[in-house]
Amino acid sequence: MTIMIPAWVNGTLTSVEKLEAHVKGLRHKAVSVFVLKGDAVLMQQRAMCKYHTPGLWTNTCCTHPEWDEAPEVCAIRRLDEELGVRGLIPQHRHHLEYRADVGGGLIEHEVVDVFVAEADETLVVLPNPDEVMAVEWVHFDDLVDQVAQHPDRYTPWLRIYLRDHAATIFGELALL
């Protein structure tokens, strides 16, 4: 199945095949979500069948919006598709851009809308094995320490978010 994503080609936003966008390092739209439960972050380990960064740990979920799909709608859709999570209302926290080598000759050059959703003890997480190998709740301070000690276990974008954007994304958690 060919997946088309919104990407800029010669300054014009157009629909581009997802793999082509990553091979060429085209600037493209993306959405990232962090689900928090108190001071813990719901992390996922990417499935081994993913075409880039398989097996690495990353934020709760991330994706590319469909053409004309609002970022908020995309965030809710992807929480359900990747993790079976329903009923959360992600709040927009940040808009950022980054470029990172994700291995295998692929480049992520994303313009990202970042969302945070608050969960409670009743949250049900049912990972889709085509997307997610494992999930884990990690206290924010422990996450920062783990990423610093073992950066190769985490996606490049998560490392960028924590290094350059933690205060904006996580607010008080990042300031403690």
From Swiss-Prot:
Transit peptide is among the record's keywords: no
Q: For binding Mg(2+), which residues are annotated in this chain's numbering?
A: E82
Localization annotation: Cytoplasm
Pfam families recorded: NUDIX (PF00293)
What reactions does this protein catalyze?
isopentenyl diphosphate = dimethylallyl diphosphate
The UniProt entry annotates the active site at C62, E110
Q: Which family does it belong to?
A: Belongs to the IPP isomerase type 1 family.
Species whose genome carries this gene = Roseobacter denitrificans (strain ATCC 33942 / OCh 114) (Erythrobacter sp. (strain OCh 114))
Q: Which PROSITE patterns match?
A: NUDIX (PS51462)
Function, in words: Catalyzes the 1,3-allylic rearrangement of the homoallylic substrate isopentenyl (IPP) to its highly electrophilic allylic isomer, dimethylallyl diphosphate (DMAPP).
Identification of the protein by name: Isopentenyl-diphosphate Delta-isomerase
* UniProt GO molecular function: isopentenyl-diphosphate delta-isomerase activity; metal ion binding
Give the domain of life. Bacteria
